Amino acid sequence: MQQHPDQLKLEEEPYLKGTVNTVIYHNDTNLYTVLKVKVTETSEAIEDKAVSVTGYFPALQEEETYTFYGKIVTHPKFGLQFQAEHFKKEIPTTKEGIIQYLSSDLFEGIGKKTAEEIVKKLGDSAINKILADASVLYDVPRLSKKKADTLAGALQRHQGLEQIMISLNQFGFGPQLSMKIYQAYESETLEKIQENPYQLVKDVEGIGFGKADELGSRMGLSGNHPERVKAAILYTLETTCLSEGHTYIETEQLIIDTQSLLNQSAREGQRITEMDAANAIIALGENKDIVIEDGRCYFPSLFYAEQNVAKRVKHIASQTEYENQFPESEFLLALGELEERMDVQYAPSQKEAIQKALSSPMLLLTGGPGTGKTTVIRGIVELYGELHGVSLDPSAYKKDEAFPIVLAAPTGRAAKRMSESTGLPAVTIHRLLGWNGAEGFTHTEDQPIEGKLLIIDEASMLDIWLANHLFKAIPDHIQIIIVGDEDQLPSVGPGQVLRDLLASQVIPTVRLTDIYRQAEGSSIVELAHQMKNGLLPNNLTAPTKDRSFIRCGGSQIKEVVEKVVANALKKGYTAKDIQVLAPMYRGKAGINELNVMLQDILNPPKEKRRELKFGDVVYRTGDKILQLVNQPENNVFNGDIGEITSIFYAKENTEKEDMAVVSFDGNEMTFTKKDFNQFTHAYCCSIHKSQGSEFPIVVLPVVKGYYRMLRRNLLYTAITRAKKFLILCGEEEALEWGVKNNDATVRQTSLKNRLSVQVEEMDAELEALQKELPFSVHDANIGMEGITPFDFMKEEQQ
């Protein structure tokens, strides 16, 4: 009998057959599994009777027999292991084995007695008979037709998994990604892929256009196949919006970019024409995969996020109940008493900001460093309590009684700064909205947030997705104050919410321009405002009491930074006080190399200092680390800085995994070693990651090797992180070039224009579009609930 080619391939692979004694570990999310297997047969030189088998599997059953295909590896701590790429379930052939198999947790509703009846009726070949014809079960006592069909279907799925995994492996998918694909499609996996391999991009996290296109090519799909062109358009739209911060792309530009992508590797001379791309865009629009409006193409989540934010902002801003709420004489009297009590003298623009904040439904407060934004926020809070006769002591309120003033910011560190400056509780926006993981946000339009006054700080970091969720959850009766510096870097995610709100001129706005910290002798603030205008001081290299410039070339940066940090340590500063910032990761002056050097200075190895190696990186207790992945459910966000407080080795815990405990300002999280890619060292970090934070000492290398990244708003953001001291090191020419370079990408957004449209017109437009769509526009993130910018971006995995 001729063997199937796949079977020949399997027999050539190293294998291990055995019974699963124990499932040591199984991750329900990524399916990573560690098993202890009693070996009955193997192609390898394995002397142990029981071996650890690792791989990505569904929930395998203890006491069941499987054949694993892969290779022997030696783990540095756990010794010899069999690393499985795929596996197959051995069909039991004895009556006892079949009864145990059918009555296992794999088959819901089949108990031992029913399994015994099946074996009694069908004999030792029961499983093969059921796989061949499900109707053989219909005459089995104790088994209804519905249960019989369910059992037969489950058997087909479990037995089919073996062939599916083999095929996916041949398609070039690794075991982890193969399991993700199987989870998405189950028994229909191969049919779905054959039907349209590009559907994988939409349905399976971790598969990008490149991987799907490689598969499409292997399957013989033509270069101008409609599904390929549509997938390329979605990929281009997604990656451009995420990398450039746009909420849309002009249709003409989208066609050009798609042609450029696909024609780089045209198949068999099949080039994509403008008409091919245009037809695909029309088809995507008709299928509601994108929204086309006035020559612009949007993802639905971005289109409706902008629509909803504009509608809510205009509605809230139109409230009139706060006008003339307090007579001017009463306001001025209370303000004067506040100035005396707090020993502060408010400037005219600051008084205007406080008065508008208390008499408007919404206020935008903007200004650069040192202009008194924090002073104004503190004044608003104090005067609100005074004029409304409410206590500002959180302990005076009962557990179920809402505190009237709500303070929030996009990141944990920004919220902490807000709390420190006001003396009141402050939270992240995700915490305010009640993020609860996969279920999304607790607070929505149906269950709005509580309070009377809401102040949002660091609003330049607010992207359109989060802004949409925020404004949906704000009830009409809450006054809103939005604070931020429009000259800082925009949000990581799409949109430019603060800039668009300011440009729309539909919301009362106060711009603080007078610099107060400069009067206190802060040359850092003076430098920031000069940079904002494209200028540098004549005395740039002359040392001041809070700023210095050290000339050096790119090859000398590590040595200079090392000396600066060592000197700061001698003066009593700690790793928490010192922050090195750089715009690039690679190179001698890059973040990666600087972190290695800084760790050796700030947290060197010691005899009792525990450490773990992850790839080429060593982590130690006491290390300063930077979170890279949003985990709103744990109140930890991309950009948060923490400290490794404990390290536990695998032999010391029941999970049998190396672990690190990280404290983010008292909020502790435990990471298993395989999740160490969620953070990195924070002795040196990117300027983007530092946004929303302040540090006593900032060390900023600026060299010509950074030229691709040097821009005015980047440098402006970097130097405004320094609270007490700023040490610039590098080349004057590089700094001058960066300050003159104001060519930051102009984000393409529609929020400003939508804010100028009347609410009635917007309602009519939304209603017309809703009739064409298969879902409710009130859920702006259909299919993407709770998604962050990083969740939205799919990266290819092997």
Curated annotation (Swiss-Prot):
Subcellular location: Cytoplasm, Nucleoid
UniProt GO cellular component terms: cytoplasm; exodeoxyribonuclease V complex; nucleoid
Induction: Approximately 25 monomers per cell during exponential growth (at protein level).
Disulfide bond residue pairs: none
TM region positions: none
Reaction catalysed by this enzyme: Couples ATP hydrolysis with the unwinding of duplex DNA at the replication fork by translocating in the 5'-3' direction. This creates two antiparallel DNA single strands (ssDNA). The leading ssDNA polymer is the template for DNA polymerase III holoenzyme which synthesizes a continuous strand; ATP + H2O = ADP + phosphate + H(+)
Domain of life: Bacteria
InterPro entries the UniProt entry points to: AAA+_ATPase (IPR003593), Coronavir_polyprotein_1ab (IPR050534), P-loop_NTPase (IPR027417), RecD2 (IPR006345), RecD2-like_HHH (IPR029493), RecD2_N_OB (IPR055446), RecD2_SH13 (IPR041451), UvrD-like_helicase_C (IPR027785)
Pfam families in the record: AAA_30, HHH_RecD2, OB_YrrC, SH3_13, UvrD_C_2
Binding site for ATP: 370-374
Key word Cytoplasm present: yes
MF GO annotations: 5'-3' DNA helicase activity; ATP binding; ATP hydrolysis activity; DNA binding; single-stranded DNA helicase activity
EC identifiers of the protein: 5.6.2.3
HAMAP family: RecD2
Subunit composition and interactions: Interacts with SSB (sbbA).
Protein family membership: Belongs to the RecD family. RecD2 subfamily.
Function according to Swiss-Prot or TrEMBL: In vivo may favor replication restart by preventing RecA from binding to blocked replication forks, avoiding unnecessary recombination during replication restart. Acts as a negative modulator of the RecA-ssDNA filament, may dissasemble RecA threads, can act as both a positive and negative regulator of strand exchange. Probably stabilizes or aids normal replication fork progression, is important for survival after treatment with DNA-damaging agents that can result in replication fork stress. Overcomes the inhibition of replication restart by RecA/RecO, probably by displacing RecA.
Other facts: There are no RecB or RecC proteins in this organism. In B.anthracis it is involved in mismatch repair, in D.radiodurans it is involved in resistance to oxidative damage.
Name used for this protein in its record: ATP-dependent RecD2 DNA helicase
Source species: Bacillus subtilis (strain 168)
Encoding gene per record: recD2
